[in-house]
Amino acid sequence: MANNDAVLKRLEQKGAEADQIIEYLKQQVSLLKEKAILQATLREEKKLRVENAKLKKEIEELKQELIQAEIQNGVKQIPFPSGTPLHANSMVSENVIQSTAVTTVSSGTKEQIKGGTGDEKKAKEKIEKKGEKKEKKQQSIAGSADSKPIDVSRLDLRIGCIITARKHPDADSLYVEEVDVGEIAPRTVVSGLVNHVPLEQMQNRMVILLCNLKPAKMRGVLSQAMVMCASSPEKIEILAPPNGSVPGDRITFDAFPGEPDKELNPKKKIWEQIQPDLHTNDECVATYKGVPFEVKGKGVCRAQTMSNSGIK
């Protein structure tokens, strides 16, 4: 019995010690929470102080700009008295000063409407001249772009390799592909090929891509290029690059040299004007006005079986 009592006492003692330790740990956790909140508050306060300082600086700069503009427009500046507090009996004089300032500003505005000072006229003329120069430059750039012939050289056609293909989550007839076109990151491409090409045949497939169409969303997925195919009302076949092609290889046309547009302007309908002249010939070779799609030093692009068909 004595032994049992001793064991019980030890257990009670250990239990009391455990309670004390738990209470101590609770206090420490509470202190740590308070400390963390305090640190977060201090960080936020510091951040707000920095932002306030920036805002004050911006306000001061804007005030100085406003003062300079008023001076240029002939508005008289009334300095505020320094170190002299305004008392209740000075309200009348304050109102007089304010009304004078308003009158002066409005008179300055009237002068500005009438034509402004000589300096202001010069500044306006300078701005107008700059605007005219900028407009002329933009017109010349647009003119040079429009002066390029509308032919297949405007298209950025490249070899790509489909890394993965999957069905579109919201459209039964569409595939979503990730395609390597020789850039840092693959491009996402949406194609309406579900009814023409089995999914397993899309994986790791070499294709030809039109890469400078403006990216467009297709049922919620942004498509960044278009897979080129031989096409008829009954059938579609993906065009195949020549053996030895690698992602990023350019498609060229001997009779149509030139650099492609960075991005085809949808308003100019350039692709729509070129597409009717894209066909496969009697030997299933892809052509533009009879000139083959070619990868320099590697060969021509072709359809599997579709001859004398459109391409899109």
Swiss-Prot record:
Cleaved by caspase-7 in response to apoptosis to produce EMAP-II. The modification N6-succinyllysine is found at residue 269. Signal peptide: none annotated. Residues 54-194 are annotated as: Interaction with HSP90B1. Residues 151-252 form the tRNA-binding domain. Residues 101-114 are annotated as: Required for endothelial cell death. There is a cross-link at residue 137 (Glycyl lysine isopeptide (Lys-Gly) (interchain with G-Cter in SUMO1)). It is found in: Nucleus; Cytoplasm, Cytosol; Secreted; Endoplasmic reticulum. Residues 6-46 are annotated as: Required for fibroblast proliferation. CDD domains: tRNA_bind_EMAP-II_like. It comes from the Eukaryota. Residues 114-192 are annotated as: Required for endothelial cell migration. InterPro entries: NA-bd_OB-fold (IPR012340), tRNA-bd_dom (IPR002547), Tyrosine-tRNA_ligase_regulator (IPR051270). Homodimer. Part of the multisynthetase complex (MSC), a multisubunit complex that groups tRNA ligases for Arg (RARS1), Asp (DARS1), Gln (QARS1), Ile (IARS1), Leu (LARS1), Lys (KARS1), Met (MARS1) the bifunctional ligase for Glu and Pro (EPRS1) and the auxiliary subunits AIMP1/p43, AIMP2/p38 and EEF1E1/p18. Interacts (via N-terminus) with RARS1 (via N-terminus). Part of a complex composed of RARS1, QARS1 and AIMP1. Interacts (via C-terminus) with SMURF2. Interacts (via N-terminus) with HSP90B1/gp96 (via C-terminus). Interacts with PSMA7. Interacts with TARS3. PANTHER family: AMINOACYL TRNA SYNTHASE COMPLEX-INTERACTING MULTIFUNCTIONAL PROTEIN 1, TRNA-AMINOACYLATION COFACTOR ARC1 FAMILY MEMBER. Non-catalytic component of the multisynthase complex. Stimulates the catalytic activity of cytoplasmic arginyl-tRNA synthase. Binds tRNA. Possesses inflammatory cytokine activity. Negatively regulates TGF-beta signaling through stabilization of SMURF2 by binding to SMURF2 and inhibiting its SMAD7-mediated degradation. Involved in glucose homeostasis through induction of glucagon secretion at low glucose levels. Promotes dermal fibroblast proliferation and wound repair. Regulates KDELR1-mediated retention of HSP90B1/gp96 in the endoplasmic reticulum. This is Aminoacyl tRNA synthase complex-interacting multifunctional protein 1. It comes from Homo sapiens (Human).
